[in-house]
A protein has these predicted regions:
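Conserved hydrophobic beta-strands of the Rossmann-like cofactor-binding core
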Residues: 3-6, 66-67
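N-terminal Rossmann NAD(P)H-binding glycine-rich loop of SDR-like oxidoreductase domains
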Residues: 7-10, 14-19
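Rossmann-fold cofactor-recognition segment
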Residues: 33-47
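A hydrophobic alpha-helix adjacent to the NAD(P)-binding/active-site core of NAD(P)-dependent oxidoreductases
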Residues: 37, 82-83
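Conserved Rossmann-fold cofactor-binding substructure of NAD(P)-dependent oxidoreductases
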Residues: 43-61
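Hydrophobic positions on the long internal alpha-helix
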Residues: 67, 93-101
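Catalytic loop of short-chain dehydrogenase/reductase
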Residues: 72-76, 80, 104-137
């Protein structure tokens, strides 16, 4: 069976993903802010590095899969937090564990949404991040 790491594995889509993978007999490392096998705050550089370091220590032989599901919605009220977690958290973990995925020819799935456009950000900023502004101007 495979070895999978899931960010945001204690809630929502991430929790269901962990449940299904375990049911199939895979080893799953749940990465979450409070209740994970690896606990870390992916909004911070330190938290991201902790995840990368711990995954390398736990499975230097590689990962079969990485699922990036950790995210916050516009309801959190902080554009900085949304971008720090939903974008930079995911990108940093992908880049930092890419070598582990390569070792086992593993796959990476990044879960995303259009939360940035839900009344929390200026629409010109949201359009830039969504790459829509070039078509409109």
């Amino acid at each position: 069976m495979g070895i999978y790491a899931v960010t945001g594995g204690s809630h929502g889509i991430g929790a269901k993903t962990v449940e299904l993978l375990k049911k199939e007999g895979h080893e799953v490392i749940n990465i979450d802010l409070l209740k994970g096998d690896i606990t870390a705050d992916l909004t911070t550089l330190e938290g991201r590095q902790k995840v990368i370091d711990e995954l390398h220590a736990l499975h230097p032989e590689g990962l079969d899969g990485l699922i990036l599901s950790a995210a916050v919605s516009g309801a959190c009220g902080s554009l900085t937090k949304i971008i720090s977690l939903n974008y930079f958290g995911a990108v940093s973990v992908i880049k930092g564990t890419y070598d582990l995925l390569e070792k086992k020819h593993g796959s990476c799935v990044a879960v995303s949404s259009n939360v940035i456009s839900q009344d929390i950000a200026r629409m010109d900023i949201a359009d830039l991040l969504n790459n829509n502004s070039d078509d409109e101007h």
